[in-house]
A protein has these predicted regions:
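N-terminal loops that bind phosphate or other acidic moieties
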Residues: 1-141
Length: 141
C-alpha cells in the first residue's frame, strides 16, 4: 500500500479511484452520486462500499446526505471508514460474510424505521376515546 501511495500520490476521490479502484468500485461511486442526485438513499454494506462512498463524497459532498451504513463490517478499516463518512451503522453484529448479507439483514430495520417516521400519526392526531376498553375488547389486555 505504501509503495502504491508513493507511485500514486492522488488524494482526491477521482484520483484514488483511478489509481486503486476497480471498475466495480468506480461503478458504485458513480451509482451513489447518481442516486443522491435522484434523491434515493444508498444502503452501504461492507468495506468496499465504504471506500466507494468515501470517493463519491469527495467528488460530490451532497452524496453524504443519502448514505446509510447498514452495518459495521468486521473487516479491518471499517470503523475508520465509517468515522470518516460520519456514519453510525444501523447494526453492529461483527459480520464479514460478504454477498450483501449485512445490507440484507439491515434492510428490514431501515424500512421499518422509514415507515414509522413517515407513516405513524402522532397520538394527538388519533381519535382515541378509551384505549384501555378498546384493547380489552380485542383481548389484548
Amino acid at each position: 500500500v505504501e509503495k502504491g501511495l508513493m507511485l500514486h500520490p492522488e488524494k482526491d476521490g477521482f484520483g484514488l479511484l483511478r489509481a486503486f479502484g476497480g471498475y466495480e468500485t468506480a461503478a458504485m461511486a458513480g451509482g451513489m452520486i447518481a442516486a443522491a442526485h435522484a434523491g434515493i438513499p444508498v444502503l452501504l454494506d461492507g468495506l468496499l462500499t465504504y471506500a466507494a462512498a468515501l470517493c463519491a463524497v469527495d467528488m460530490d459532498v451532497m452524496v453524504s446526505k443519502y448514505l446509510v451504513a447498514g452495518h459495521r463490517s468486521a473487516a479491518p478499516g471499517s470503523s475508520q471508514a465509517l468515522l470518516a463518512l460520519g456514519l453510525s451503522p444501523v447494526l453492529d453484529l461483527g459480520m464479514q460474510l460478504g454477498e450483501g448479507s449485512g445490507a440484507a439483514v439491515a434492510w428490514p430495520v431501515v424500512r421499518l424505521a422509514s415507515h414509522m417516521i413517515h407513516g405513524l400519526k402522532a397520538f394527538g392526531e388519533l381519535d382515541v376515546k378509551n384505549s384501555t376498553r378498546d384493547l380489552q375488547c380485542l383481548g389484548l389486555l
